[in-house]
Amino acid sequence: MNLTAYRDLSPAALRERIRQGEFDGPTAGLANGYAQANLMIVRRELAYDFLLFCQRNPKPCPLLDVTDPGSFEPRHAAPGADIRTDFPRYRIYRNGELDQEVQDITPFWEDDMVAFLIGCSFSFEAALLANGVPVRHIEDGHNVPMYRTNIACQPAGGLSGPMVVSMRPMPANKVVRAVQVTSRFPSVHGAPVHVGDPRLLGIADLAKPDFGEPSELREGEVPVFWACGVTPQAVAMQARPELVITHAPGHMFITDLRDEQLGVI
């Protein structure tokens, strides 16, 4: 998909294109300067447990917004937007199994549903680029690679599961700067959780991500791993609630929140 026509659109204009079905691809590199968000939608009966899960696991699940039960408007992150239509792609999980992937969840929406918007590391990629740190999946025009790890999240109620991480390869001499830059943005995962040998995270093969597409690791480069907001999907697969709706990995919500609003220093 050619992203040129979409790169300079405002968040509202980009959401409108998505709502109309014009754009349904990964959102890395779009709406630079604005925060992007992952999605987890649960029924009200599970909402407190998931809120507690996020509170106990802020690295993979930093909350940007939570809707009122039955409301599909993220009033803090993007007033006037519609959670049901404004992501490029969604996933429907039933009893822990991926049932289908769709572009509009209006037919699946229920009056007691609560939506959680979770910060996404796409949000700090403009800052990485501005500081001379390359972002391979943007360079190569593909989705970021994501992996399940052997790091167990802190459970909450009946929710438990492994942390998922995203990976960005970079020259070894850029790693310190990448840590410095991303540490400013804890609301979108902050500093990396691991640098170097993927086997220490239980990742056997970087060429076979669990979500997204692989990035080439070139000579002299180091893999750098950040906690990822796809973690709730791994939790849904393990906890097996009757119905959960998420974004499709890499297909994020474009908020009206400026990256710099989320910076802490």
Curated annotation (Swiss-Prot):
GO MF, one example: lyase activity
Keywords noted in UniProt: Lyase
E.C. code: 4.2.1.-
First-tier enzyme category under EC: lyase
Source organism superkingdom: Bacteria
Pfam families: D-Glu_cyclase (PF07286)
NCBIfam families: PRK05463.1 (NF003969)
UniProt similarity note: Belongs to the D-glutamate cyclase family.
Protein name per Swiss-Prot or TrEMBL: Putative hydro-lyase PST_2764
